């Protein structure tokens, strides 16, 4: 699959609109996320490994905020023959259209219901795995606990939630250090100072990261009895919570 290079913020603009997962972003998303999120490939691959361990036959898997389908495809490769169904949801028509193309390129005996809709409206039931891969951070903070509660209720006992997020830190020097390390990561991947600055402006009103403590407290308050941070690189993290 050809991957187009992300140059969305390469030209100076007087007015930076809020970031949207529109057709422009969908067309370069694979390149954008690889160059912006440290450890993204490892996270995607490990989601597949978690699926192999936790997905039970005749259950459902939910990929909430599926974007181009990377996590869904990783899961699909690991659960052949289990008579499961994946429900992959994204609210961007452009993302869903490209996700469908990616799903069509791979043969599998695991059906995928690809839904263009709001993840807050999805009914979750008989789930052995739910994935929120850099999705929760884009929801209004007041809606996050309700979604986690819905996920907990829809998971079967022993089911797992994989939650990946950009995180923030209450310790100001640590916040500054790891934010700077992330900016260096983006510079090393070819982004200019202009691109970094303009994308930051586009994201500041639409992406609101939480601290790890907030994530853990939210998960345990809704009933998850087992929680662990399994991956962190700079200010990006992935967690698991087991019912």
Curated annotation (Swiss-Prot):
UniProt protein name: Carboxy-S-adenosyl-L-methionine synthase
Class of the enzyme per the UniProt entry, highest EC level: transferase
GO biological process: tRNA wobble uridine modification
Superkingdom of the source species: Bacteria
Annotated EC: 2.1.3.-
Pfam family, one: Methyltransf_25
Entry keyword Transmembrane helix: no
Keywords, comma-separated and alphabetical: S-adenosyl-L-methionine, Transferase
Organism: Shewanella baltica (strain OS155 / ATCC BAA-1091)
Lineage: Bacteria, Pseudomonadati, Pseudomonadota, Gammaproteobacteria, Alteromonadales
Quaternary context: Homodimer.
Catalysed reactions listed for this entry: prephenate + S-adenosyl-L-methionine = carboxy-S-adenosyl-L-methionine + 3-phenylpyruvate + H2O
Gene Ontology MF: a single term: S-adenosyl-L-methionine binding
Similarity remark: Belongs to the class I-like SAM-binding methyltransferase superfamily. Cx-SAM synthase family.
Chain sites annotated for binding S-adenosyl-L-methionine: 40, 65-67, 90-91, 118-119, 133, 200
